[in-house]
Amino acid sequence: MSVRLPSSMSYGEEEEPDVLQKMWDKSKQQPFVPLGSLLTAGAVLLAARSMKRGEKLKTQRYFRYRIGFQLATLVALVGGGFYYGTETSQHKQTREDKLREKAKQREKLWIEELERRDAIIQARKQRLEESKKELRELAKQGFIEEKESNDKKED
């Protein structure tokens, strides 16, 4: 008989979001940061293109835009950090409460699974005892019949 863990048992299967999901969630929280990053990248690309064409004034303008976009991105990042800093502690508390609730639910499922398995084992033991008792009675009956038939033959 192989011993398997109950189906309610899981190891570290917390629904951890992958990297892309985390990035998407953070982008939803602070939409100005990715926007500023995209604008900065666009300004750098335009500056590189104008530099390649030899347009010095446009190149300087695009690099100035890049600095402005980087500053705006940094301000958005710091401002969002302050704003979401207090919310993060509340979110962390909520997450811990959810994890506690999930642990209680798993413990309950684990206990139910163990009780179910115990009931199955007890039922098997009872059937085994009943089968043994029935076999003993049949064997006893067979011996009695054999003894009676031997007694009749001797008479």
Swiss-Prot record:
Residues 111-141 form a coiled coil. Pfam families: HIG_1_N (PF04588). One of its GO terms (cellular component) is plasma membrane. The keyword Disulfide bond does not apply. InterPro entries: Hypoxia_induced_domain (IPR007667), RCF1 (IPR050355). Keywords: Coiled coil, Membrane, Mitochondrion, Transmembrane, Transmembrane helix. It is a multi-pass membrane protein. Residues 4-95 form the HIG1 domain. PROSITE patterns: HIG1. It comes from the Eukaryota. It is found in: Mitochondrion membrane. Belongs to the RCF1 family. Associates with the respiratory chain complex III/complex IV supercomplex. Cytochrome c oxidase subunit which plays a role in assembly of respiratory supercomplexes. This is Respiratory supercomplex factor 1, mitochondrial.
